[in-house]
């Protein structure tokens, strides 16, 4: 199935590209999330008329993402969690806790799906390096310091 991309999609293309994808990927992901439209003759003509407007909106989203990344990168965010002897946590610190801590400290809205934890959830006290995937091609490296809570 051919679709016209309305924004940059990782491993697929950029705004305005006409690409071939599997029908299920188009119907279940690209089209419902507003990332693409089916490449019919009418849609191609409509897209060409709106291309400048869409590029301007994409640039605004990208600039906002870069500003967010600059505001949160290279900082240390502290999360308090209950811990036992030896620094082992009761439970774990996951993406939701990291996203909440970064959002509260920076004032920028970060979703838990944007937090990248390559080694999985944090289960001990210490300082850990994580990545926040703000937007396509925009990542911010942060440090999370997990400390024992006073409980």
Swiss-Prot record:
Q: Which family does it belong to?
A: Belongs to the bacterial ribosomal protein bL9 family.
Q: For this UniProt record, give its keywords in alphabetical order, as a comma-separated list.
A: Ribonucleoprotein, Ribosomal protein, RNA-binding, rRNA-binding
Gene Ontology CC entries for this record: ribonucleoprotein complex; ribosome
Q: Which PANTHER family match?
A: 50S RIBOSOMAL PROTEIN L9
What is the stated purpose of this protein? Binds to the 23S rRNA.
Q: Does the keyword rRNA-binding apply?
A: yes
| Molecular function, one GO term | structural constituent of ribosome
User: This chain belongs to which protein, by name?
Assistant: Large ribosomal subunit protein bL9
Under InterPro entries, the record lists: Ribosomal_bL9, Ribosomal_bL9/RNase_H1_N, Ribosomal_bL9_bac/chp, Ribosomal_bL9_C, Ribosomal_bL9_C_sf, Ribosomal_bL9_N, Ribosomal_bL9_N_sf
Which species is the source of this protein? Francisella philomiragia subsp. philomiragia (strain ATCC 25017 / CCUG 19701 / FSC 153 / O#319-036)
Q: Name one GO biological process term.
A: translation
Gene3D superfamilies listed in its UniProt record: Ribosomal protein L9, C-terminal domain, Ribosomal protein L9, N-terminal domain
């Amino acid at each position: 199935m051919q679709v016209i991309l309305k924004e940059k999609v990782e491993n697929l293309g950029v705004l305005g590209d006409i690409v071939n994808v599997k029908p299920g990927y188009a119907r279940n992901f690209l089209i419902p999330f507003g990332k693409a439209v089916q490449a019919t003759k009418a849609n191609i003509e409509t897209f060409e008329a709106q291309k400048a407007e869409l590029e301007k909106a994409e640039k605004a989203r990208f600039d906002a993402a870069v500003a967010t990344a600059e505001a949160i990168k290279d900082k240390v965010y502290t999360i308090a969690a209950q811990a036992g002897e030896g620094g082992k946590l009761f439970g774990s610190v996951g993406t939701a806790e990291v996203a909440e801590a970064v959002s509260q400290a920076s004032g920028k809205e970060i979703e838990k799906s944007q937090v990248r934890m390559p080694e999985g959830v944090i289960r001990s006290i210490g300082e850990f390096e994580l990545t926040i995937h703000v937007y396509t091609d925009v990542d911010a490296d942060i440090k999370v310091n997990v400390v024992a809570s006073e409980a």
